[in-house]
Amino acid sequence: MDPSSKPLREIPGSYGIPFFQPIKDRLEYFYGTGGRDEYFRSRMQKYQSTVFRANMPPGPFVSSNPKVIVLLDAKSFPILFDVSKVEKKDLFTGTYMPSTKLTGGYRVLSYLDPSEPRHAQLKNLLFFMLKNSSNRVIPQFETTYTELFEGLEAELAKNGKAAFNDVGEQAAFRFLGRAYFNSNPEETKLGTSAPTLISSWVLFNLAPTLDLGLPWFLQEPLLHTFRLPAFLIKSTYNKLYDYFQSVATPVMEQAEKLGVPKDEAVHNILFAVCFNTFGGVKILFPNTLKWIGLAGENLHTQLAEEIRGAIKSYGDGNVTLEAIEQMPLTKSVVYESLRIEPPVPPQYGKAKSNFTIESHDATFEVKKGEMLFGYQPFATKDPKVFDRPEEYVPDRFVGDGEALLKYVWWSNGPETESPTVENKQCAGKDFVVLITRLFVIELFRRYDSFEIELGESPLGAAVTLTFLKRASI
């Protein structure tokens, strides 16, 4: 449909009676049949529109204004990345911002708008950290995930099954320490405590928007109505801070050159590694394992052949960037995992001025100051863009399918674009894609196939391995 021919439509939906309706909506969002997906789907069907007004949790008393304009289609969603039209200040977590007492008193990079001078300094610091670690990524990943798979094999041999998530989190943080700082955190004062420390600290940041599976009469007063006091987590946070302060010397020296005080740099490094990177991998690796596991042995055979063939022909028996580029199916299965189940479902942006947005069917007027909210799992399953959108299609992005990558937005921007100091796209976008490919590569270098069981988890999939078939060639 030509944009000029799309009818101008008033944004449907209402926010209801202040205070009472946001609480009612919060209860529906967390405890209604069908969960948050149904919260959005029912309204989309009611209003016959993928753009509508609604309240977003947490609401009272954590958030002063729960009102948002919801975007659920691939046409309207990208407005959230246009920083000329939307402001990104203090809305990383949505309609509320966690206390800066949880981040050393600083507004860390995720909460800064690109227009703020500190944004460019801190993002350049992360670019330096990524570049400085580039030569360590592949060898340290291989070392760490060989350790992981050896442990899983031993557990499987002993008990007939092996839970992936907890040991996977240990491996992920061990790898990040080795890759970024040339330091195995398990050989420091942290020991193996980092994943538990991080999860506790993240809970204090995100509690108002999390569903931990508790009964509503416990979860509502404890998590969703008032903020958890920051002082309760201070000693936990300080243990993480001390680790990064002790190992991140080259990054801190670069921070001073960029005009960022060392203390502020450490808090930002901690947030980037623990919240952004570890938090993403904690969800993404089990999800990827889940989808590939469910796809079955035929896909496993194809991946094993592609991966081993490329390593032999282009890497002289080793994993290299050149060899990885010759693995189109491997790349596609990672992108498809990121499409069908993006690790961070919500994105927000506040209108800088009056402007119009388009869905596939209509045009809508947005007023300055209104909050836009995109629920990514709907936008990346838009049936007007993707064939069989609800299915995991392993080769979706192979060949001509690469054209669809502009609709993959897990990184807070299109997969076809790159992070810069001028945008809010994830600084580690390419790093996360690379290590997820490496995860698939190490899996199929070692095994011909595997089988899994799935369980419940508040974040992502809980995966248990029930069978590992060692590589036959």
UniProtKB/Swiss-Prot annotation:
SUPFAM superfamilies: Cytochrome P450
Keyword Lipid biosynthesis: yes
GO biological process entries: jasmonic acid biosynthetic process; oxylipin biosynthetic process; sterol metabolic process
One Pfam assignment: p450
Swiss-Prot/TrEMBL catalytic activity: (13S)-hydroperoxy-(9Z,11E,15Z)-octadecatrienoate = (9Z,13S,15Z)-12,13-epoxyoctadeca-9,11,15-trienoate + H2O; (13S)-hydroperoxy-(9Z,11E)-octadecadienoate = (9Z,13S)-12,13-epoxyoctadeca-9,11-dienoate + H2O
EC main group: lyase
Binding-site residues for (13S)-hydroperoxy-(9Z,11E)-octadecadienoate, renumbered to this chain: S199, K282
GO cellular component assignments: chloroplast envelope; chloroplast thylakoid membrane
Cofactor(s) named in the record: heme b
Entry's EC annotation: 4.2.1.92
Pathway: Lipid metabolism; oxylipin biosynthesis
Protein name: Allene oxide synthase CYP74A2
Native source organism of the sequence: Parthenium argentatum
Gene that this polypeptide is encoded by: CYP74A2
